[in-house]
Amino acid sequence: MATTTSVLTIGNGEISSDLIDPLDFSIARAPISALVGGDGTENARITTAIFAGESGAPRDAVVLNAAAAIAAYDGEFELNLHDRIAKGVEKAISAVDSGAARELLAQWVELSQQLSTPRV
């Protein structure tokens, strides 16, 4: 998020190279220092704050990374990479703002706790 990112895409037997800039998606660039987490407790606090609607560089990083994953998963390869990521940004913002991401995280936490409980 501090600068642009080079992305290689493989498809239809071809390799293409793109340059992704957060500014292309109305996401501000941020220094690496704004993205540094901490221990598990601190990272959980940051994640909870993001999913509760707190804005800032950590949320922007989550949105942009989720958008890239969505772009790869959705498979709309007839669109160029920038358009796929732009659609992913919209979906990621919607998931965070609607509470869907927070709800899914709560389900993962619950499942993780169930799986870590010793069975007798």
Regions found by a protein language model. Give the residues of each.
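Glycine-rich anion-binding loops and their surrounding alpha/beta cores
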Residues: M1-V120
